C-alpha cells in the first residue's frame, strides 16, 4: 500500500535484497510500474540477488542500476547480462573509530575507484558507470566528519567526471535522524540546502557538471 501511494509521484525505487526484486516484478505484473522506472539496487549481493537483477535487465527493464559493493559483482553481472547496462559504485567510507558496527568493508575505497574504472569499466563492452553511492553509517549530520567524507566523495566524482562524462548521478545514503525524544531538534531544510549548495559549489570550482 505504501509503495502504491508513493508510486503516484515521480519516484525511483531502491532495493537491498533479492526479495525486493520480487516486489519490483510484482508491481510490474500488476501494472503499477513500467519498464522505464529507475531501480537502484543496493546492498550486499548474493548470487540469487545478482541473478534477479540480471533477469530484470535481460527482460527489458531499462533503468536498473546495480551498485557495486565489491569487485566480484561486476564479473558476475557481466556473465549473466546480455544487454548494455548501467552500474554504480559504492564508496567505502572511512568510518568514525567509535562506531559500533563496522560496515566499510562494503564498497570500494576512495583511492581505488579511478584505477578500477580505468582498468575494468572504461573499455567494458556492456557496462556503463552512471552513479556513485555515498553512504555514511552514522547518518546525515552536521558534523566535521560528515562534511569531510562528503568532500572526499565529491573529489572522486569530479575526477571521474573528467574522464567518464557518463557518470551523472550521486546517491546519498545513511538517512536523516528521526525524532526519538521530545528534545529532538534537527533542521532538515538546512541540511538538505547545505548539501545541495556544497555539491553545486564544489562542482563549479572543479569545472564539472553537478550530478543528479
What do the PLM-derived regions correspond to, one by one?
Residues 1-169, 198:
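Active-site-proximal beta-alpha core segment in soluble small-molecule metabolic enzymes
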Residues 2, 142-148, 179-192:
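Short glycine/threonine-rich loop-to-helix capping motif typified by GTGT followed
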Residues 137, 170-179:
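Glycine-rich beta-strand-to-loop/alpha-helix junction loops that act as flexible
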Residues 153, 191-204:
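Alpha-helix-loop-beta-strand connector modules within alpha/beta enzyme cores
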Residues 206-212:
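Short, intrinsically disordered, charge-balanced linker/junction segments flanking boundaries
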Amino acid at each position: 500500500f505504501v509503495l502504491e501511494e508513493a508510486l503516484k509521484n515521480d519516484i525511483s525505487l531502491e532495493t537491498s535484497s533479492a526479495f525486493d526484486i520480487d516486489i519490483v516484478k510484482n508491481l510490474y505484473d500488476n501494472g503499477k510500474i513500467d519498464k522505464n522506472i529507475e531501480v537502484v539496487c543496493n546492498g550486499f549481493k548474493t548470487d540469487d540477488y545478482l541473478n534477479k537483477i540480471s533477469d530484470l535487465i535481460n527482460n527489458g527493464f531499462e533503468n536498473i542500476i546495480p551498485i557495486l559493493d565489491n569487485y566480484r559483482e561486476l564479473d558476475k553481472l557481466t556473465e549473466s547480462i546480455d544487454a548494455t547496462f548501467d552500474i554504480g559504485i559504492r564508496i567505502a567510507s572511512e568510518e568514525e573509530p567509535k562506531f559500533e558496527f563496522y560496515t566499510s568493508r562494503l564498497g570500494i575505497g576512495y583511492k581505488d575507484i579511478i584505477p578500477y574504472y580505468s582498468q575494468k569499466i572504461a573499455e567494458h563492452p556492456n557496462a556503463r558507470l552512471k552513479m556513485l553511492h555515498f553512504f555514511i553509517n552514522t547518518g546525515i549530520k552536521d558534523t566535521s566528519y560528515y562534511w569531510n567524507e562528503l568532500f572526499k566523495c565529491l573529489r572522486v566524482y569530479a575526477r571521474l567526471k573528467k574522464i567518464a562524462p557518463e557518470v551523472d548521478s550521486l546517491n546519498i545514503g545513511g538517512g536523516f535522524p528521526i525524532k526519538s525524544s521530545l528534545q529532538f531538534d534537527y533542521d532538515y531544510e538546512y541540511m538538505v540546502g547545505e548539501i545541495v549548495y556544497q555539491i553545486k559549489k564544489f562542482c563549479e570550482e572543479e569545472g564539472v557538471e553537478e550530478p543528479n
